[in-house]
Amino acid sequence: VSILKYYLYKATKAVEFYRPIMYLFFLAQGLSFTQIAILEALYNLTTLFGEIPTGYIGDRVGRRNSLLIGTSIIALTLLGIGLSNSFLPLAGLYVCWSMGYNFRSGSEDAWLYDTLTDDLSEDEFARVRGRGESVALAVGAGAAVVGGYLGSIDLSYPWFVAAGVTSIGVVVLLSLDDPETYKRTNSEALSLRQTVGIVRDVLTRRQLRAFLLYYYVLYAGVTYLVFVFLQPIFETVVLDLGVAQSQVESLLGWFYAAYSIVGAVLSYYTGTIERTVGLRTWFLVLPFAVSGALVGMYFVPLLALPTFLLIRGLSDVTRSFAGQYINDRIETLGRATVLSAMAMVSGLAVVPFQLGSGVISDTVSPLFALAVGGVVLAGGSGAILLWQEPIGEKRG
């Protein structure tokens, strides 16, 4: 029953309504591109500095309560953004928005893993999480199309609908309870110093440190750039194919829908992929396959469209596998904080990739920036593998 409610919660989380019109909305409120960039920076900085404290709170007050706090903040923030018409209120709301996701980030996976542990089925984490992502992405595909239509009527409407759908998640969460595995830990006695010690102990393990660099820094950093440059590259490719400029926005809405559907299908089969391919083979092959695709796009730009669909589809499956791998190697006490620490490192790692790729894109082109990212991914992954194989077959 808890897992079915988890799927329902994931469906309310997939609020892609505002995604196709997000930047159009900000421009319509009179914001400059510089101000939009400042909003993104505020979001990332809040994520960076908020991950550990919110993970700690999640370990203290409970996974369910942490998710409840985060979801409530997000729903109110989305409503606020729809009502805003200037930069300063949006800046404050962006900080709140990021904090809402901080409360969710470590606690969601920690709640799911501990719930599965109650039933002695923690090995099913990747499969169940994958199914949850599949539900979220399938709902998101429809939401992207609906959001584009609502935005053509009024750019505020998608934000209001997204706030309403997110608030349904609050109702779902109120019907959930914390797992028995979590309740049996002495979480109320968990001090901040003890929490930092737990994170430090995890990061002193050489293999986990290698995995952190391999996936959370290198792979996550480079593939993040794909999501940043999708729109300008998509526009370049379809215009070269003879599509009229006036059709680009509507095509983007449908491409985002396709993008979500590919992710939904692959996420649904996460468990099958894990059994067939195995975590070790997946992580050893993936960086080099993605790297080859990114470099190939530069020489054949048309390859960008299937490459974007594939990398998007693989991202959620890979995140589920990474969550399974880390969760298998950490204890229940402090779990949310450790997972938040991983997210924090990943958020910090993205910054130099963002700055470097921005300069390269302005100087040459976004396609060239992604090709450079591909070379960095292959070279860095190879170097880490020579130093320490990041994936072990057995838990430890």
What kind of region is each of these model predictions?
Residues V1-T34, V95, L203-V226, L309-G313:
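Pair of pore-lining "gating" transmembrane helices in MFS-fold secondary transporters
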Residues Y18-R19, F25, S156-F160, D201-V265:
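A single, central transmembrane helix in multi-pass transporters
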Residues S72-S86, A91, L174, F288-P301, ...:
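C-terminal ends and interior cores of transmembrane alpha-helices
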Residues L27-A28, F87, V139-A162, Q231-V243, ...:
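Transmembrane alpha-helix termini and helix-breaking/packing motifs in multi-pass membrane transporters
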Residues A162-S187, L386-G396:
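Helix-loop junctions on the cytosolic side of multi-pass membrane transporters
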Residues L173-Y214, T236-D240, F288:
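Juxtamembrane intracellular "pre-TM" segments in multi-pass secondary transporters
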Residues Y94-A138:
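Cytoplasmic helix-loop-helix junction between adjacent transmembrane helices
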